[in-house]
Amino acid sequence: MRTDALTMSLLYDYYVELLTEKQRQLFDLYYDQDYSLSEIAAAAGISRQGVHDTLARAEELLEGYERTLGCIARDARLQKQLEVIAQNAQALARIPAAAPQAGAILRAVQEIKE
């Protein structure tokens, strides 16, 4: 398939509910269970080409969802900004008068990350 397995797994985690049940099943067998196309075809009772086409369509859909919705990119930007906020709050914590507010900011950042 076109995109690496790690990227596909990440896309799947974000957008799994937007795939059909059949696409989910085949995707799970291929990417999570590490079945070959032939093994999946035998288990699903369809042709190897049918498995390939279904997986290719699922991959195309997942990539399209990310292009359109951008959830993964947004979350990556959010994580980077949270790190910047945490670093600035740690710097503020060194100022005695700002320490309580800095602590509150750091706790809020930690809650968001969880």
Task: State each model region's role.
Residues 47-48:
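Helix-turn-helix DNA-binding motif, specifically the short coil turn and the N-cap/start of the second
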Residues 3-15:
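Short, Lys/Arg-enriched N-terminal segment that forms or immediately precedes the first helix
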Residues 26, 40-41, 51:
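Hydrophobic positions on the alpha-helical face of helix-turn-helix-like DNA-binding modules
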Residues 68-94:
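Intrinsically disordered, low-complexity basic tails/linkers immediately adjacent to helix-turn-helix/homeobox/MYB/SANT
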Residues 54-57:
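Residues within the DNA-recognition helix of helix-turn-helix
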Residues 59-66:
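C-terminal flanking helix
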